[in-house]
Amino acid sequence: MTDVQVIAIDGPAGSGKSTVARAVAARCGLGYLDTGAMYRSVAFAALHGGVAPDDAEVVANLARNMELSIDPDGTVIVDGVDATIEIRGPEVTRAVSIVAANPEVRDEMRARQRRWAAERGGGVMEGRDIGTVVFPDARLKVYLDASPEVRAARRSKEVADLSYERVASDLA
């Protein structure tokens, strides 16, 4: 993977990863991938299919077999269904940490992330552990953080149906 030039942007929810990653990708003319949207897509597929997020084997199979498209404009298509709005909603938000803790799901998403970068010769990728686990040799690694108050305010703006207080408690 040494010929793949990745800019890895990491940080907690609401720290500005997506905003910065999109701006860097646009400015540098590079592809952009929100890896968190990938995990949210698996959670969406599970919930949409009536599968409990903690059913590790079934969720891992969903991750391996789902068709996933994440466009540069943020449109997310999961198995032919536009999930752009739903993956940011409260139901998926509650389920995604369970799904993302599944080692087989992580293995599949990591493989898809590496494949995405290899097909493009690199790009700007944002998400948790992108610079430590997925691309430890990334050309540039950025870690963003913000105060809990700023993170909660940013996240509640992203998810209009969540109150500031609910987001603050989820981020704590």
Describe the predicted segments one by one.
Residues 17:
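Conserved lysine of the Walker
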Residues 1-4:
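Phosphate-binding P-loop
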Residues 12:
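P-loop (Walker A) phosphate-binding loop of NTP-binding proteins
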Residues 20:
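Hydrophobic positions on the alpha1 helix immediately C-terminal to the Walker A/P-loop
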Residues 7-9:
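Hydrophobic anchor at the beta1->P-loop junction of P-loop NTPases
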Residues 130, 141-148, 158-159:
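Glycine-rich phosphate-binding loops of nucleotide-dependent enzymes
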